[in-house]
Amino acid sequence: MNRIEDQARELFSPLGPTYDRVGAALSLGQDPRWRRYLVSRLSRGGHVLDVATGTGLVAAELRRRGFDVTGVDKSPEMLAIAERRFGGGVPLIRASADALPLDPASFDHLTFTYLLRYVVDPAATLVELARVVRPGGFVASLEFGVPSGAAGPLWSLYVGGVLPLAGRVLRNGWREVGDFLGGSIRDFWRRHPLDRQLAWWHGAGLSGVEVTRLSLGGAVVIWGRKA
């Protein structure tokens, strides 16, 4: 496990059962809507691999929309919560996104959420994710964004002031998340602006790549089709 993955696991594993409820609250109720939009980018039907599945929120939405789902995550703590959520109804695999123990072209589609900020080589990871998708299938991602224009100062105030303060009030690991998240998002987009990220997608063999910014740019959904 690399240092970045270590940091991510140390941050999020202690959140446990509070992750879903408090995470939605800290996004001002937007996170569930973002996840629904992510899933809506896929064509209907088929078997979806949900990478960085966490507690299974995206996987649950995929099932609700009629997909078969397999979840992958590096954290045993998060997978334990997902297992309780699904009661064995969704296969769950503990694995790293950059080394999936899966055959090429073994899934119809693939989703991933809040992943590329935590890997050493995002471009190589995206190649590995696309490897397991059948030609014609979709890959879709959800990541936090950095709003521009009039929304930018409000976002900076929220992630720089409100989130850390809320984390201190909530405790149980949320203090560290509140302190970390804003800087992590800002640094990712500074190092990897959208044009660079789109180059990763094209380099992974994905075509027709599209981008939608949600909630004034607070979230970014990217999706494309495996050539």
Task: Indicate where each model-derived feature is located.
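A short SAM/SAH-binding and catalytic strip from SAM-dependent methyltransferases
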Residues: 108-122
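Conserved beta-strand signature within the Rossmann-like core of class I S-adenosyl-L-methionine
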Residues: 136-144
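C-terminal alpha-helical "lid/dimerization" subdomain adjacent to the S-adenosyl-L-methionine
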Residues: 6, 146-200, 210
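A short glycine-rich, Lys/Arg-flanked "PGG" loop and its adjoining helix->strand segment in the class I
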Residues: 123-135
